[in-house]
Amino acid sequence: MKQITGINHVGLRVRSLETARAFYEQLGFELIIGPIGPEPVAVMLHPSGVNINFILNTTSDASASNVLMDLPEKHTGFTHIALEIDDLEAVQQQLAAREIPITETVELPDGAILIFIRDPDGNVIELHKPA
């Protein structure tokens, strides 16, 4: 799809938001949002434009493999990739034409639209249309 213009952010489930913040600050990231929300999320931004969303993990089994956002039990690890798009309607039409189901659509308070799909292995992909 030529409407994808780049990676918007990466989601990472962590055991401690404070520990993650301290580590990623050493790499040049700066906290820009949070922690906020019922399942606390903190957002850090690198001067290069790389954006990481850290989501607090509340499950103690570190060896488990479920990191998907829409399942009730969570574990550490990457949760999804977010691809930035520039034409929401064209993307929705292309997904429908390819019989790729949209699992969730979210409109953020700033007007951005998020469409969630899964790859054949069940990995979550967010298609992010900025406001």
Descriptions of predicted regions:
Residues 10:
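Polyanion-binding surface elements
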Residues 19, 88-92:
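Short, conserved charged micro-motifs
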Residues 85:
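A short, basic/aromatic alpha-helical/loop segment that forms part
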Residues 124-127:
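Short glycine-/small-residue motifs
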Residues 20-25, 95, 122:
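Conserved active-site tyrosine of GNAT-family acetyltransferases
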Residues 1-7, 30-82, 92-118, 130-131:
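Vicinal oxygen chelate
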